Every structure is written in structure tokens, then in C-alpha cells.
Amino acid sequence: MAQPGSGCKATTRCLEGTAPPAMAQSDAEALAGALDKDEGRASPCTPSTPSVCSPPSAASSVPSAGKNICSSCGLEILDRYLLKVNNLIWHVRCLECSVCRTSLRQQNSCYIKNKEIYCKMDYFSRFGTKCARCGRQIYASDWVRRARGNAYHLACFACFSCKRQLSTGEEFGLVEEKVLCRIHYDTMIENLKRAAENGNGLTLEGAVPSEQDSQPKPAKRARTSFTAEQLQVMQAQFAQDNNPDAQTLQKLADMTGLSRRVIQVWFQNCRARHKKHTPQHPVPPSGAPPTRLPSALSDDIHYSPFSSPERARMVTLHGYIESQVQCGQVHCRLPYTAPPVHLKADLDGPLSSRGEKVILFQY
């Protein structure tokens, strides 16, 4: 994938310094091969071909300018190994990413931009291709769509209004980095024309249909109307049975030509109206025992006098009561007056509603 700017991908290579080689030739070749491995074809620049630079010998007449100077710290490299990237050399410990400061001595590639060293992650996060819709990075393995120099993820190339993903060969409009399908692009043009005719100032961004505008509005439910014959049939049935069963509903549907659901709803509405206009009578709770007294106190109730043939048994008795007492073989008459015993009348008794006080006598 092409990289923006003039950044080039370079390979790092470990080179021998002033000391004689103590490594086996196969090990050196394996290390050089590992360091020269290229990661993908993302760089437009051809990686630099590493070359082995031998340090100047003591008998050589090469000036001191030929010394191996580290590009990072500026000191002479006297170590046994050094790293070389695009004809620039570093100490093994000095080659690191300029952003995250991660050492690149174990990496087989790095990236240079404006004389700055970057690791792969930081280079692509700063200079890599990004999606014009979501702003995230586009990797080399991602499928993309391009429009007017912008790159989009395949899923991000969708209409801004209806969120529908556009397919290959489909017409679309691009308005201020917003992708519109043909339908909503024409809607935007109509909004601009209507605003111009009415003299209203409408910006281009305001003319773009929003996501709420693209959603279809729910249609209003059509009200059901009944003919006089249909109402007559249903009202006659309601007078007989206000809650018909499924079989009766089917018969009414066949007679009126309406659906069972419509007839069922009509009966539900009629029952609700009938219940609303019918006076409600209070019903005593089923768990409470019946009582003969109202909720008011008994002292506040005025009673009517009680007259009954048996009243004589319940009044005070005076005088003598004849009683036979057996005294041996002699029968005699003794005067006897029974002491009164006052008892409270039971509220639930038959006399509680008469207000009489009962006086009983013992014999």
C-alpha cells in the first residue's frame, strides 16, 4: 500500500566494526538475512541495499572524517557491531523510535520521515492512509473504495442518510465528505431549490437529509365505518349477549362481511361504554359477616317501642308467686319474691333493635 509523503522504509543491518570477526560465517549470514527481511510492499521507496563498511586501517591515509559516527548521539562507534539504515549508522543501543522510544535493534525494518526514525505502528498511525468516514487506519489487507482521492473502508462507504452500503457501479453523490445515494442526493437538490424559491437561506449542510428525515413516518390507521345494516345486526346480538364466543363472532362476520377482529373490537368498545354509563352499586365484601346494625354507634340510634304478646313475660313481676314446696308430708304456700337479675342485651339478639332492657328472675 502506498505511503504518503516521502517516508521510506529502510532495513536495518548489523555490521562488523573495528574488531576482527569472531562469529561464524553462517551465523553472520543468518543475522544479515533476518535483518534484511522486508515486511510487505507498503513503501513506495526501494529499501536501501545494505553494504558492509570496513573500518579504516591504521596504515590508511583516510582522514578522520571517515570514522563511523552515530547519527543519533554523534559519537564515534567503537563497538564491535553497528546498525546501518540508508547509509546512516547508529550504535546498536541508539537506534530507537522517535515517538515511543522503543529500541529497534530487534526489528528487521524501520521507517524514516523527515530524518526521524519511526517504528511500524507509529509511522502508520501518523502518516498511514486513513478512512475519510471513520478516521481509522486502513491496513494493506483491507478492502477499500476510493472517491475523489479519499479512501473508505468497504463498510464505511454508505449513504449518510439511509446508512445503506453502496455497491460497485451504483451512482452516488459526495457532499462535504458525506456520501449520499442517488435518492437522497436528489432530495438534497430539491431542498436547495425549494429554499431558493421561498427566499430562505439554507446551507449545503442543512439541505442534506438527516437520518431522522430518511426514516419513513408511520401511516395513520384508517377508521372503520359501519353501515346501518351491520350496526343493526351487531346491536341485536349485543342485546342478547354482550360477550359472544368465537362461533358467534364467526357467524356475525359471515352476516356482516366484516372480520372477526373488527367485530370483537366493536363488542369490547360497547361493553366499555355500557359499563361506564351503568350506575355502580356498592357490594359488601364477601369475607365480612352480615350485621343488622349500621356503621353508626348504637347510642345515636332512635328505636321504636316494642309491643308483643310475650311482653308480659319480660316485665317486672310483683306480688306473690305460688310455689309448691314439699316439706316432709306437708304442702304449704309461701310468699316469694324473686330478686331481679339485670343482663345486658346482646347486640345480635332479637331485642337489640328494640332498645328494651331485659330483666330476668330466678325461681
Swiss-Prot record:
Q: Where is the signal peptide?
A: none
GO terms under biological process: cerebral cortex GABAergic interneuron migration; cerebral cortex neuron differentiation; cerebral cortex radially oriented cell migration; cerebral cortex tangential migration; forebrain neuron development; forebrain neuron fate commitment; neuron maturation; neuron migration
Annotated DNA-binding residue span(s)? 219-278
Does Repeat show up as a keyword for this record? yes
Where are the residues of the annotated region Required for interaction with LDB1?
Answer: 55-194
Keywords from UniProt, A to Z, are: Developmental protein, Differentiation, DNA-binding, Homeobox, LIM domain, Metal-binding, Neurogenesis, Nucleus, Repeat, Transcription, Transcription regulation, Zinc
Major localization class:
nucleus
Where is the sequence biased in composition, kind Pro residues?
A: 281-292
Record GO cellular component, one term: nucleus
Localized where?
Nucleus
SUPFAM superfamilies linked to this entry: Glucocorticoid receptor-like (DNA-binding domain), Homeodomain-like
Give this protein's Gene Ontology molecular function annotations: DNA binding; DNA-binding transcription factor activity; DNA-binding transcription factor activity, RNA polymerase II-specific; metal ion binding
Q: Where is the composition biased (Low complexity)?
A: 42-65
Q: Where is this region: Disordered?
A: 19-65, 203-224, 274-300
State what the entry records as the consequence of deleting this gene: Mice lacking Lhx6 fail to thrive, develop general weakness and die within the first 2 weeks after birth.
Q: Which residues cross the membrane?
A: none
PANTHER family registered for this protein in UniProt: LIM/HOMEOBOX PROTEIN LHX, LIM_HOMEOBOX PROTEIN LHX6
Quaternary structure, from the entry: Interacts with LDB1 (via the LIM zinc-binding domains).
- The protein in question is named LIM/homeobox protein Lhx6
Lineage, uppermost ranks:
Eukaryota, Metazoa, Chordata, Craniata, Vertebrata
Q: Which gene encodes it?
A: Lhx6
